[in-house]
Amino acid sequence: MNSKSKYAILLISSVLVVYAIIGGMLGRVSAQNGSYQQLSIFMEVLSRIQNDYVDEPSVKNAVDGAIRGLVENVDPYGGYLTAKDVVFYKNYDLFKTPGIGAILAKPPRLGYPVVISTIPGGSAAKAGLSPGDIIESIDGVTTREMNLVQVHGILSNPVGKPAALSIIKSRRAEPDTITVPREITQPPAIDTKMLENNIAYVKVPYLAAGKTAEVRRQLDALLKKGATDVVLDLRYTAGGDDKEAVQLANLFLDSGTIAYLQGQKFPKETFTANATDLLTKAPVAVLVNQATAGAAEIVAAAIEDNHRGQVVGVKTFGSGSVQKLISLDDGSALLVSVAKYFTPSGKEIQDVDPQDSGIKPTVEIRQTMEETVEPDDQDVLPPAKDQPTKEEDRQLNRAIEILKDPSKISATKKAA
């Protein structure tokens, strides 16, 4: 058997194995949807390359490229991981692994990682990265061919050496080069305070494990001081622990569905509010924006769909899936999304169509460009975007108005 034949057999078998795994997980390998026909086209293309390409192709590069393209075109939150990537993925922790302190996504239509949110006090926030920034390259290496695990991997190493990022910001024609230290990010604290009219304000920057217990303690203290209403600020709250999201929503619900999880081959798992975990029945308004993603979206949807309170702001990002790591014989692995989170009303938080993803607020309040803090315009670090002054914060002001006078909800919807 010549080397080209060996190459063809290896590549076909590798892709078939991966295709079978992904198809089996997602329930997509069937004659009805034309999957096998697409495989035959792939094999025809492979045959043409084998017979007509000017040089003998690199087996490793071809196999890796074919598998990577297959996985990431099917699943933007998945990826083909090398053995080195697998070790990093299993040990990764946002607050224990060196990095830049940013929550990232890789929208399939964009092809590059984008910043959803930055952790207050983290190196990305201090360096001026903002939600919506596109990371075009890291240390001169393009990120277009990287999955998110690989992006975080290169952002964590080498430790102590700043990462040189080429960033594309909105409304700017040319990329900016930003140097960001690689360092351990500290978990941000919950912020609570008493606003006017006895309204408790609770800001949750990140839903890490244990944060719900912290919210319970601090909010309970405000309730005992006379708070009669609650503003739960989940703007720029991305990522986090899904279990914490369920627990946080349960603080405001004594019954009903909080969310459910389901996939093609993943049995439906429903999360229901427990009356014993209820903290308060006080009126609540939840603040959200385009950087509200993941666990925070579960909370907002639970409050909204159970008619427990108003959700104020703009449509959220739309991220809510569960990944499974599938080991392969050579130490590499597939990271595949196997289930998605659904709202109590049955809507996918992370829809196939990005336009349908996310949670729409009951009261939409858009922020004007002038109300968005730009690091170049003022000596204000990006974390200040989370909490503009009360005079500037139209979303917070409207939430307060609604809590003080619920009759203003309909007027607000018309105005928005």
Please give the residue ranges for each predicted region.
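Conserved functional hotspot residues or short segments at active or partner-binding sites
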Residues: 333, 340-416
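Terminal targeting/pro-maturation regions of precursor/exported proteins
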Residues: 2-79, 111-113, 389, 394-398, ...
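Extended, small/polar residue-biased N-terminal targeting/export presequences
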Residues: 53-116, 160-179, 186-192, 400, ...
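Short clusters of hydrophobic/aromatic residues that line enzyme substrate/ligand-binding pockets
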Residues: 80, 258-259, 271, 317, ...
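Cleft-lining beta-strand/loop regions that shape enzyme active-site pockets
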Residues: 22-38, 44-54, 58-59, 114-118, ...
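A polyampholytic, Gly/Pro-enriched intrinsically disordered region
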Residues: 278-286, 331-340
